[in-house]
Structures are given as C-alpha cells and as structure tokens.
Amino acid sequence: MGIGPVKAIPKALKQAGLQQKDIDLIELNEAFASQSLAVIRELGLNPDIVNVNGGAIALGHPLGCTGAKLSVQLFDEMRKREMKNKYGVVTMCVGTGQGAAGIYEFLN
C-alpha cells in the first residue's frame, strides 16, 4: 500500500504519450483515505474526476480483484457519460509500497 500511484501514474502517462490534462476519469484504489489524499495532493489531481462513484473505502476492494473491479467501474462510467470522457486511469496500490496504473481509451 502507500502512495505507489504517485510514481506509477506519470510513468504510465509517459508510456502512453499522454499528459495528466488528457485524463478525464480516475479510479484510485485506496485502503485508507490518507492514501487518496496524498496521491491527489502529490500529483495535483482534480478531485472532481477521482472516484466519481465512491472509492474502495465505500465500495470495497476485494483482494486480488482490485484492477478488474476498478477497470469495470471506469468502463461503466465512461459508457454512462456517452464518450464525453475519452481517457481514464485505474491505479492499484500493492503491498510494500508498490503501485500500478493502467490507462484506458474509450472507443466507440
């Protein structure tokens, strides 16, 4: 756990050839509220696009299923917004401070 997404998000954006301003929605996994706050502050994320339907504290984060669960949540929200939102990020905190991030493009 921890703030691994602080390193993972910029790396994923660079690999995708995108910038933070290109991202429309973010599903940020957190086991504790302080993790989300730290990642949002460190990266200067817009809180209005982070966990728009609630995060793992409210909805749960099943062990070993976080990435799949958050990805489906992101896809569903992108679909609901009828492609007004093109890019989304999913992050996963991993034990011992590791972090992972995936970037998705919504295509019609």
Regions found by a protein language model. Give the residues of each.
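Claisen-condensing/thiolase-fold acyl-transfer catalytic domains that form or cleave C-C bonds
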Residues: 1-108
